[in-house]
Amino acid sequence: MKRGSLLWAYMAALAAGAVLAGQATGADPIKIGVVNMLTGPLAEGGRFTVNGLQLAQEEINRSGGVLGRPIELLTEDNASTNPGTVLAFSKLFTVAGIAAIVGPIASTQVQAASPAIAKAGIPTMIGGTDPSLTRVNNRWVFRARPNDLYSSKVIADFGVNTLKLKKWAIVHATDAFGQGGAKALTEALQALGVNPILDQGYSSGTQDFAPIVLAVRKSGAEVLGTYMTYPADQAIFAKQLRQLGVNIQWVGSPTTVTVTARNLAGEALHGTYAVVDFNADANDMTRAFTKQYTERFGVAPDNFASWSYDALHILALAMNNARSTEPEAVRNAILAIKGYKGLEGTYEFDRNGDGLHGYSVVRNEGGKVVFIKRVDFPVE
C-alpha cells in the first residue's frame, strides 16, 4: 500500500472508531495517545498496528468503554524515525487529559523517547523488545511483548539442543533492537558452552548484504541467528543469502515470520525457524482473532496487530480495575495484572513492567507458519 493510501485508510479507521465511540455512550471520551508508524520504512507494520488498535477499540467501546466512557485514540505519526518519535510524544504530552499512550514497537524509537516519557509521567505501553527498555529506571514504561532475554534463550536452546548445531553466525541490525538481541543471544549461547564464530551488524535499510552473506559463507557456520528490525531488510537478506548459495539452518527473531517479510521474501524464507510472541494457531482466542482480522482486512494478522490489540485492552483493564485514569493509579493497576489472557500470551507483570515471559518456536513451511513448541520462563 502506498504511503498516501495508508494514511487515508488510517484516517478512515479513526473516523469509524470515533463514530463507534459516540454510539457506545454520550460521556466524554477517555483519550489514549498512539505513536505509530504511518509513513516511512515501517509503515506496513504500522498498518497492522492500526488494525489491531481499531479492533480493540471497537470491542472495548461496545462493552461499555472504560469507567462508562468510550475510548478515543489520538494518533501521531513518527515517520518510522527516532526524531519523529520524540516529536510525536511531545505533541501528545501537550494534549490535556491524555490518560495513557500506546507507543512504538521499534526498540530504538522507544529508547529515543524514554527520557521524555519518564518526565511526562504518563503510563506508556511499548512493543520494543530490547531488554534494557524496562530497566532504565523509567517507571512509566510497560511492555506488552516478551523481551529478548527470553527470545535469545529460546533461539539458542532450540538451535543447540534440538537442531544440534554449534557453529553460529549472528547477523543483526545495529540499532537498539538488533544490538540488544545479538548481545543477549551471544550470552545465551555462551551459557550453553557455545561461542559464535561470526557477529555481523548492518544499518537498517541496507540494500546490499553481499559482504555479510559472503562472511557467513566463509565462516563455516552451520546455523544463523538473526535480529533484524525491518521486515524488508529481512527479505532482501534472505534472497541474497539464497542467491549466493548459503542454505544453512536459520533461527530468527519474530521479524523472520512477519507477514511483510514472508510476502516479500517468498521461497527464500521457506524452511526457516523463528521465535514468535504471537502464534495465530495457539488457542481458540488467537484463532478467532485471526479469522476476524482476516475477514475484516483481507490479510492475516501478525505481531504488529496482536501486541497493539493487547496493549489497548490492558490499559482499559487497568483503568477499570483502578476505577481511575490518574497516572499513579493506572501504573499500580498495570503492575497488579496477573493471569490476563491476551493474544500474545498470559500477562503477569513483573516489577520492571514486563508483562510476558516466553516465546513459541515456529517454522516457515512453504509460506505457512507452523507451531513447533512453546517455552515459558518463571516471572522474576
Predicted feature residues:
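Extracytosolic ligand-binding ectodomains
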Residues: 2-11, 15-17, 22-380
